[in-house]
Amino acid sequence: MMWWAVWCAAMVAGSVFTAAAPPTDSIDLMQMDPSLADDESLGFAMQSLSGRYAAAPWLYLLADVSHDPQRMAEFSQSSGRARPKRKMPSLSINNPMEVLRQRLLLEVARKQMREANQRQAVANRLFLQNVGKRGAWGEPASYLYNN
């Protein structure tokens, strides 16, 4: 258990000496000037934080983002919907009908196979009754030989 505390202390000590992450160009956010804050109540907070985060220009505070409802409406219209539509269960009968069709086709195929097997069994029985006999193939053996 002691190793966990030592590891945490080492991570904290190591993170103190690491440099801040470099700014990335992949984010399309405008960096706003803290002196131009829309809300007057945020002005005092921004000036006190500006010295603390001056070395990390990649850090954007949520207090800097404007809360303009017109801009939010434009954003929601440009994206298509204001909120995503929930996926409701479908009441379609297509899937159950397809399952019934498949089961019916399987049942018909089984019936045809059963009938084909029965026809083959009858043909095999006739062949075995007439093997080695001189009579006609279609006539039973008892008719040819009356002993």
From Swiss-Prot:
Subcellular location: Secreted
Signal peptide range: 1-26
Prosequence residues removed at maturation: 27-84, 135-147
Pfam families: CRF
Keyword presence, Signal: yes
Superkingdom as given in the UniProt entry: Eukaryota
Alphabetical list of InterPro entries matching this protein: Corticotropin-releasing_fac_CS (IPR018446), CRF (IPR000187)
GO CC terms: extracellular region
Modified sites of kind Valine amide: V131
GO molecular function: diuretic hormone activity
Keyword Signal assigned: yes
Gene Ontology terms: biological process: body fluid secretion
UniProt entry keywords in alphabetical sequence: Amidation, Cleavage on pair of basic residues, Hormone, Secreted, Signal
Function: Regulation of fluid secretion.
Family: Belongs to the sauvagine/corticotropin-releasing factor/urotensin I family.
Name of the protein described by the UniProt record: Diuretic hormone 45
Species of the source: Bombyx mori (Silk moth)
Gene that this polypeptide is encoded by: dh45
